[in-house]
């Protein structure tokens, strides 16, 4: 197993519910360290750029609208198999299909307002981390 980094976004619906701390606690209890974190209100341009791979999909406009509807918490998580571990903690994209005890099962309402985003691969993670954070903003903590 390798120490990896992954990007996590706590989406506007979860921020509005005041469950930021509960979500971060789950990451930490699972052995992931927060090595960078900031709260931002994404612009249409920033959200659209982040989700550019979906630009031609029918849900793109609604996705950008949702992601700009309120502040988000963007963070870099570091730890053994961080990408897979984060995805397991999040649960299925559709909260109705997410296993009990996952972040989405506990805090999400719909497939659109599904509480969190997580990188789907180490390659995506590297690209997504660089999109939101400079090297100087990431503080390694793994020993």
Swiss-Prot record:
Gene Ontology cellular component list: cytoplasm
Entry keyword Cytoplasm: yes
EC number from the UniProt entry: 2.7.4.6
Cofactor(s) needed by this chain: Mg(2+)
GO process terms (BP): CTP biosynthetic process; GTP biosynthetic process; UTP biosynthetic process
Residues in the signal sequence: none
An example molecular function term from Gene Ontology annotations: ATP binding
Chief location category: cytoplasm
Pfam families reported for this sequence: NDK (PF00334)
Catalytic reactions on record: a 2'-deoxyribonucleoside 5'-diphosphate + ATP = a 2'-deoxyribonucleoside 5'-triphosphate + ADP; a ribonucleoside 5'-diphosphate + ATP = a ribonucleoside 5'-triphosphate + ADP
Keywords of the record: ATP-binding, Cytoplasm, Kinase, Magnesium, Metal-binding, Nucleotide metabolism, Nucleotide-binding, Phosphoprotein, Transferase
InterPro entries: NDK-like_dom (IPR034907), NDK-like_dom_sf (IPR036850), Nucleoside_diP_kinase (IPR001564)
PROSITE patterns: NDPK_LIKE (PS51374)
Active-site residues per Swiss-Prot or TrEMBL entry: 117 (pros-phosphohistidine intermediate)
Top-level EC class: transferase
Subunit comment: Homotetramer.
Family: Belongs to the NDK family.
PANTHER family, A to Z: NUCLEOSIDE DIPHOSPHATE KINASE (PTHR46161), NUCLEOSIDE DIPHOSPHATE KINASE DDB_G0292928-RELATED (PTHR46161:SF3)
Its job: Major role in the synthesis of nucleoside triphosphates other than ATP. The ATP gamma phosphate is transferred to the NDP beta phosphate via a ping-pong mechanism, using a phosphorylated active-site intermediate.
Entry-linked HAMAP family: NDP_kinase
Official protein name in the record: Nucleoside diphosphate kinase
Organism for this UniProt entry: Alcanivorax borkumensis (strain ATCC 700651 / DSM 11573 / NCIMB 13689 / SK2)
